């Protein structure tokens, strides 16, 4: 798009603003030399920004910018009614941004005070109630089982500790003569002739004593 076409669009927009200014009273003195423009190139878009700087009663500047979409515009489009209506609509919005409408605020008459002052307590008493909700205990199953076997307390397998027996029994025998029936026979090695214990279900039964034969005579009945 040539620069002269952009200049024509800007001049056309300023003329519409000037016509609107002649009909209505603005909050500033209209001067077309106070307006400026710039062109922005976007992706698949081209915009024309019309800029006007206005100052308030304290002298603070404020920029008012109006965007005009000029993407794909041609010279022949400037005279169409659709394009003129589009610029007129933007011009009205631009004027409202420069001179925003003023609204009248009607203040109500102050109401009379009450004859009696309200009672006010800076620290009112409050009743506080605390509710404790007890949660139902969740039963936790042990990760390891404790097994009692043969008088020993087997610790859980997960701890991997050596089982410690609760009680240890040591049986000692004195070197006494072996006894056969009613006779006493002295032997040199009593340990070889001492009694032993029976076997019950594959385990040693300490309550069942077994005495070995200590004589070969048929007249001597040896107890087991």
From Swiss-Prot:
It is found in: Virion. It comes from the Viruses. GO terms for cellular component: virion component. Keywords: Virion. This is Uncharacterized protein L725.
